[in-house]
């Protein structure tokens, strides 16, 4: 059984005395604890120092969640506290590490890059919304490149403004490891040059199962993604939403998707696929792949009549087929209004018929009798 030590969230830890009960629990269960969760707290420097001493005693620790730990802390405090907490993980077989939602930026990279250089057992690394920027991303990637034995399966580095420089650095990591199964790097302002490098590096990771690269500039580099997709035989999930790929590449993308045996989920929202004929081709390609379970095409101004034509078949064969977001409400309202108008017409026809019958009856009455 996996023993999880979970510290209550939304607490501001400044007084070391407040840690006594927590430290006692850690010490008593040091041989049982496998996972340690400290997320959604606010840790001061002295508390981080004392807590790190207790964490270092845990014998079989493999999973660590340090997400969202420094709310309201000064930027001078954060690197010191983080370094204490990361030092406690050295010489352990850590396979999962989450440092997301800590806005430390490049200034705090030296507080944990030493761990990345030495963590040979690390498989899952989550660094979301850390304010890394291009420089911070490069520093993280350089540390990973110095670790010859690391074989990451998961990298989540979303919302970090990697831009081209950060993407080029990350591509070197992906190309070297060849072990990745899950990649998330959405909302990073990456240019086409950076995305081309990422796609070519992804090609080296034959076991990749999930790719989420939405909200980056991939319109001018998506052909490289389309070219490598047939080689990613384990791929199950792909999200290229908010990338403005347009009709031409939208069709080419789904044409390739239609031939992938393992693909199950495709997200292609808000991509300016607005041509009715192009949408029809895409719907046909979706139907050709019997393994797909979920398709999202929201925000592409899907033609209403076309949607009605394919809706029944899609919903019978897919777990989810979603083409409308805010437009969906308008679509449903139009349907309701059309229904109301039809009802009004039927009521009017019924009343007209009743009026005609009444008039006939009146005409048949002999007023002279």
Where are these regions (language model features)?
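Leucine-rich tandem repeat or coiled-coil scaffolds
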Residues: 1-369
């Amino acid at each position: 059984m996996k023993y999880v030590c979970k510290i209550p969230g939304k607490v501001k830890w400044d007084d070391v005395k407040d840690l006594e009960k927590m430290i006692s629990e850690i010490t008593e269960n040091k041989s049982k604890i496998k996972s340690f969760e400290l997320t959604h707290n606010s840790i001061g420097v002295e508390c981080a120092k004392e807590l790190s001493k207790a964490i270092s005693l845990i014998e079989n620790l493999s999973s660590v969640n340090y997400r969202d730990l420094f709310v309201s802390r000064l930027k001078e405090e954060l690197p010191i506290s983080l370094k204490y907490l990361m030092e406690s993980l050295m010489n352990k077989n850590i396979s999962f590490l989450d440092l997301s939602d800590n806005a430390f930026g490049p200034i705090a990279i030296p507080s944990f890059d030493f761990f990345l250089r030495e963590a040979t057992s690390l498989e899952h690394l989550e660094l979301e919304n850390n304010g890394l920027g291009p420089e911070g991303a490069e520093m993280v990637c350089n540390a990973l490149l110095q670790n010859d034995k690391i074989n990451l399966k998961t990298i989540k580095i979303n919302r970090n403004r990697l831009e081209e420089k950060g993407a080029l650095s990350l591509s070197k990591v992906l190309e070297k490891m060849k072990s990745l199964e899950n990649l998330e790097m959405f909302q990073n302002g990456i240019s086409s040059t950076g995305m081309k490098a990422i796609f070519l590096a992804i090609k080296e990771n034959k076991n990749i199962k999930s790719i989420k690269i939405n909200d980056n500039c991939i319109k001018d580099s998506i052909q490289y993604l389309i070219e490598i997709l047939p080689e990613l035989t384990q791929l199950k999930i792909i999200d290229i939403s908010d990338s403005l790929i347009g009709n031409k590449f939208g069709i080419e993308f789904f044409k390739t998707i239609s031939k992938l045996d393992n693909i199950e989920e495709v997200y292609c929202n808000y991509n300016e696929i607005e041509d009715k004929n192009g949408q029809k081709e895409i719907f046909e390609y979706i139907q050709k792949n019997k393994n797909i379970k979920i398709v999202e095409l929201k925000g592409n101004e899907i033609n209403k009549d076309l949607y009605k034509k394919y809706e029944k078949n899609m919903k019978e064969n897919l777990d989810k087929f979603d083409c409308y977001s805010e437009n969906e409400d308008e679509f449903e309202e139009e349907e309701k209004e059309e229904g109301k108008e039809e009802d009004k017409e039927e009521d009017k026809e019924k009343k007209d018929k009743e009026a005609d019958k009444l008039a006939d009856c009146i005409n048949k009455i002999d007023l002279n009798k």
